[in-house]
Amino acid sequence: MTILKEGGNIFKSEQGPLTQRIATKDVQASINFIEKITGLVYDEEDWLGTTGKKNDPDGEFEKNSSGDLDLNTDASKISKEQLIAKLTSWLKSKGIDDEAIMNKGRKKTDGWIHNAGDQVHFRTPIAGNSKNGYVQTDFMFTNNPEFQRGAKRGGTPQFGGTDRAILLSSIARGRGLKFSPKFGLVDPAQGDEVVASNWNDIAPMLLGKGAKESDTITVETMLAFLKKDPNYEELIAPWKETMEKAGKQVPESTFESLADKQLSRIVTLASVLVK
């Protein structure tokens, strides 16, 4: 069996990546360590994407590991600067020099902390022990952690989290809106004004009347609700094209038009008359 070592690719030296994939069994201990040095609390609902969720009975490492740790971080509880200060304090307590701590663009990528956009990346000892190697932790800051939990869900064996994000965007475009993974549903006709950031509001706007957050959790649940929509094929067309290029099979619509129903009745009647 080949064990994949690659994970997040922020931290690297001239010799190669400084981080690796993390086994699902090591995720909890690693997050416990992060909580200890930062004072933050990350419940499982704040483990974004596939973090800690991949379990496959065949035992293959890739199917039982995550490339990095994605953590839903509430910007109202801690700022990026405060988090960096806490991480820096711990690193210094381990004898790491100031100059070695921060990545500096492309000039220095072998540091321990990388500050970029809405995220802080940290080269984290797996289960708190450097002997286990390191995994990249992505602290993903947001002003709306409830929305981000739903925006950055993992996937299923058939359709991953990226596939789900593409489907959300495809449906939103079909409804004359845009899906922002940071803000929610926005209206391009109103200067990208946010029109919904709660998933129980987003669900019916995208999938139709009666849809709830639970219907948006996976590609499969979204398609199951949406495929009765008369505009199903049009709504998923961009997503479907992307999936077919990736060799993934997409369910057909189950919507039955009036013409379809009439044709079905004629066929049924004809078969009865023949008998």
Where are these regions (language model features)?
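Proteolytic processing junctions in secreted/extracellular precursors
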Residues: 4-7, 12-14, 252, 256, ...
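Active-site nucleotide-donor binding segment shared across nucleotidyl transfer reactions
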Residues: 31-81
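Catalytic cores of NTP-dependent nucleotidyl/adenyl transfer enzymes across multiple folds
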Residues: 116, 123-262
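Structural alpha-beta junctions
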Residues: 36-42, 92-99, 173-180
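Metal-dependent nucleotidyltransferase catalytic core
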Residues: 17-34, 73-131
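NAD-dependent ADP-ribosyltransferases
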Residues: 1, 5, 66-68, 84-90
